[in-house]
Amino acid sequence: MSLYSQYMDEIETRKNDLGLSPKPIDDAELLSEIIAQIKDAGNQHRKDSLKFFTYNTLPGTTSAAGVKAQFLKEIILRQASVEEISTTFAFELLSHMKGGPSVSVLLDLALSDDETIAKPAAEVLKTQVFLYEADTQRLEAAFKADNANAKDILASYARADFFTKLPEIDEKIDVVTYIAGEGDISTDLLSPGNQAHSRSDRELHGQCMMTPEAQQEIAD
């Protein structure tokens, strides 16, 4: 049985037993299989595969994120062609991946000699804040080599454009929900530490904010 078939079975189980949406993809091998189906214009699973690739691949530092970033790079460099993913949309998808391999790919593109690719990649990098030391070292080396895009990116970081150019928010925001998590709380996800094993599966993890008994009490 293929990994994709196993994933389809898992989707049905989650839906029927738990009432959950498909689990976000974090496995490189599964996503590679999905990409192969996207490339196959006649594949019966192509439409769903495109949705899983675009909207249901876990970002950050997962192995799947690495595969996704590389495929988007191929599209931008015109080494691969997907009708539904333009160069502009590929850059947009990279911008939402929040660090990890996507930053490495963006640096590859921003520091390239092709300005039609380097410039938009640099603009995306200006919005990214999850850079490793290896990433900043690449920018430093390019800056010292008089790379114009590297200078532009670093100047943007120095101005904190990634923060100051965020959309304005209301002066006053009414509190509509109060959450009291149990035990050690993660500040980025505001969730109980004793349920950390399920954090990558956000929808499943969200159920741990309240005991099943308490959820049923509210439902009743």
List PLM regions with ranges.
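Amphipathic alpha-helical scaffolding segments comprising HEAT/armadillo-like alpha-solenoid repeats
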Residues: 28-35, 59-78, 99-111, 130-142
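Structural detector for internal amphipathic alpha-helices that build alpha-solenoid repeat scaffolds
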Residues: 18-23, 47-63, 77, 84-99, ...
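Alpha-helix initiation and N-capping motif
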Residues: 8, 31, 69, 183-187, ...
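Short inter-helical turns and helix N-cap capping residues of alpha-solenoid HEAT/ARM repeat scaffolds
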Residues: 42, 83, 113-115, 147
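Fe-S-dependent hydro-lyases/dehydratases of central metabolism
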Residues: 96, 109-110, 117-220
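Short amphipathic alpha-helical segments that mediate assembly, nucleic-acid/protein binding
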Residues: 4, 31, 46, 68-69, ...
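Amphipathic alpha-helical packing elements
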Residues: 2-40
